[in-house]
């Protein structure tokens, strides 16, 4: 079966606000709610002038090994979807909707009330004053709160807990660092093949791997996959290309053209649906009747409007997953076009901001490198969906900045929230 989307290449003109993807705070840092008290800081905690108290990944590992976390209360401040995918053992999730976050900022909402699980509520209530409370987000490394800066979720919760008399700290390096170094203490719901890479991403959407594709002709072809593969703009496939498709969600796999032609791989992962995001690569098993195909005729080029196909692509992925069939999303190298479609799917189906969706995919597949213009289309898609990061931490007048991957010139952007 084949379901091919047809349409002429459309040049995507990006607005000033959509010309780059946003960062926000510096990589590895995030604004805090205040300086906080340094009382009760024990071994493994570090502070500096104005710094919020933290504990190291090594300290947490030793606590879990020695006492099984009996003297700890771990609070995961990431979005619920990321917590469900993987988290540190014994952690309680504290993802906060924007409305509740505003109430929390005003001081009229107890932290216990934002914990959804009754058993976790009781555990928090009985241990928050007696145990060491350790909060973590995705990747905060060193945190120097800046005067007047709006509070992040992590900063807001940490400050409130310390104001309430709790011995509260944040985990230096966040979940990414701890999982990289001590994965045996993390609980995950994804296949082992999608384990995060050894280089954790920062909590801010990193565009260092993005490319502004060369101005090649619209007639370029993906017909053959050479032994030394390149994306259609001539960018080489990174040497860290995974050997097999990567599981992003249950039944959703991200891969390359080679994966789509390997029956052993398709059978191993139960893949019956294949989304081919290229104009000319063949659907290898189209006539056998065993696989359902959809083809999106888009080249990896700045002029291409991939976003026009988001609704059909998302519907195709949903159809496969609803039938509990594996669906492979691939382009040529599996780093640009297919990544863009996968990120769009996470944004719509999981209500993730572009920051969170991008980081979610990058944790599974470290070598992603979307076309820079495709990221602009994802920013527009984020606006269409009305999404924002869970921090909800800047006013409309604030400007966020990010640099291009080529010359590091700064471009202002005001649509993407940092996490």
From Swiss-Prot:
EC number: 3.1.3.16, 3.1.3.48
GO BP: any one term: negative regulation of ERK1 and ERK2 cascade
Gene Ontology CC: cytoplasm; cytosol
Keywords (A to Z) from UniProt: Cytoplasm, Hydrolase, Protein phosphatase
Active-site residues per Swiss-Prot or TrEMBL entry: 331 (phosphocysteine intermediate)
One Gene Ontology molecular-function label: MAP kinase tyrosine/serine/threonine phosphatase activity
Catalytic class of the enzyme: hydrolase
Compositionally biased intervals (Polar residues): 227-240
Annotated segments matching region Disordered: 1-41, 216-240
Catalysis: reaction(s): O-phospho-L-tyrosyl-[protein] + H2O = L-tyrosyl-[protein] + phosphate; O-phospho-L-seryl-[protein] + H2O = L-seryl-[protein] + phosphate; O-phospho-L-threonyl-[protein] + H2O = L-threonyl-[protein] + phosphate
Activity modulation notes: Strongly inhibited by sodium orthovanadate.
Subunit structure: Interacts with MAPK1/ERK2; the interaction enhances DUSP7 phosphatase activity.
Protein's name in the database: Dual specificity protein phosphatase 7
Organism from which the protein derives: Rattus norvegicus (Rat)
């Amino acid at each position: 079966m084949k379901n091919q989307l047809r349409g002429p290449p459309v040049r995507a003109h990006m607005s000033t606000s959509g010309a780059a993807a946003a960062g926000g705070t510096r990589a590895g840092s995030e604004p805090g709610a205040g300086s906080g008290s340094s009382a009760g800081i024990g071994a493994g905690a570090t502070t500096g002038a104005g710094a919020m108290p933290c504990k190291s990944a090594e300290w947490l590992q030793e606590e879990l090994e020695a006492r099984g976390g009996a003297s700890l209360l771990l609070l995961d401040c990431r979005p619920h979807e990321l917590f469900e995918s993987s988290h540190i053992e014994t952690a309680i999730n504290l993802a906060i909707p924007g409305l509740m976050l505003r109430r929390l900022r005003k001081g009229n909402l107890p932290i216990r009330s934002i914990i959804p699980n009754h058993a976790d509520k009781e555990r928090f209530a009985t241990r928050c004053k007696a145990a060491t409370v350790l909060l973590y987000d995705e990747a905060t490394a060193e945190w120097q709160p800046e005067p007047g800066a709006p509070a992040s979720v992590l900063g807001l919760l940490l400050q409130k807990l310390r104001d309430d008399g709790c011995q509260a700290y944040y985990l230096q390096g966040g979940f990414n660092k701890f999982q990289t170094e001590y994965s045996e203490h993390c609980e995950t719901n994804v296949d082992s093949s999608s384990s995060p890479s050894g280089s954790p991403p920062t909590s801010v959407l990193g565009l260092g791997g993005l490319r502004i594709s060369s101005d090649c002709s619209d007639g370029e072809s993906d017909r053959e996959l050479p032994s030394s593969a390149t994306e259609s703009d001539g960018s080489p496939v990174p040497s860290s290309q995974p050997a097999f498709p990567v599981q992003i969600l249950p039944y959703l796999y991200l891969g390359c053209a080679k994966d789509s032609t390997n029956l052993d791989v398709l059978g191993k992962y139960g893949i019956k649906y294949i989304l081919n995001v290229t104009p000319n690569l063949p659907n290898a098993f189209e006539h056998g009747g065993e696989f359902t195909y959809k083809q999106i005729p888009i080249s990896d080029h700045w002029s291409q409007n991939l976003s026009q196909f988001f609704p059909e692509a998302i519907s195709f992925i949903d159809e496969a997953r609803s039938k509990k069939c594996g669906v492979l999303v691939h382009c040529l190298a599996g780093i640009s076009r297919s990544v863009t479609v996968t990120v769009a799917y996470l944004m719509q189906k999981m209500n993730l901001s572009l920051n969170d969706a991008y980081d979610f995919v990058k944790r599974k597949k470290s070598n992603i490198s979307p076309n820079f213009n495709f990221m602009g289309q994802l920013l527009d898609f984020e606006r269409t969906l009305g999404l924002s990061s869970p921090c909800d931490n800047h006013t409309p007048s604030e400007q966020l900045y990010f640099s291009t991957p080529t010359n590091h010139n700064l471009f202002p952007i005001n649509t993407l929230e940092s996490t």
